[in-house]
Amino acid sequence: MEYAILFLPLIGALIGYVIKVFGDIYSEIVTTLFVSAAAILSIILFYNGIVYEDYGNYKIYQWIASGKFVVNASINIDPLSSIMLVVVSLVSALVHIYSIGYMSHDPDKPRFMCYLSLFTFAMFTLVVSDNFLQLFFGWEGVGLCSYLLIGFWYKKESANDAAIKAFIVNRIGDFGLAIGIFLIFFFFGSI
């Protein structure tokens, strides 16, 4: 279930992008259903955590191995990450549902819905990361998707300017986060 929660928005974004050739509505339905399914599973996961204390660390694969230094791509489920999964997934599902009507006039709806699903996947990655390197990649994914969503109407100069400003501000945060991760590795030998 933990793997499904993390990867459903990514799979929904990919399928939504591919099936847009059959019509905008299919892309909207797929991305919204996949994110909504992740929201339902997040609520179940949260319930299992509260009632059965069903928390854990779920390894996806070994990412980096160099001597004694090993970094796994893992899903860490604890009380904080489970409640954040519920918050992020419910808000994202509601935004997806609202966007179906809000973007009804736009010919690029499938692209917007795919960006939203990718944003949800990046937020999930950020929330359930087991180490600082994975957290950094989730942070970068959120920054990239923010840039893409802010600059969605790229033909408008104001949207492009706002996207570039957001991108620059995110780079400042990235720099600070990267320095912090480097210092943690330098002093503790682990991330």
Give the positions of each predicted feature.
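...captures the hydrophobic TM-helix bundle architecture rather than a specific catalytic motif
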Residues: 1-191
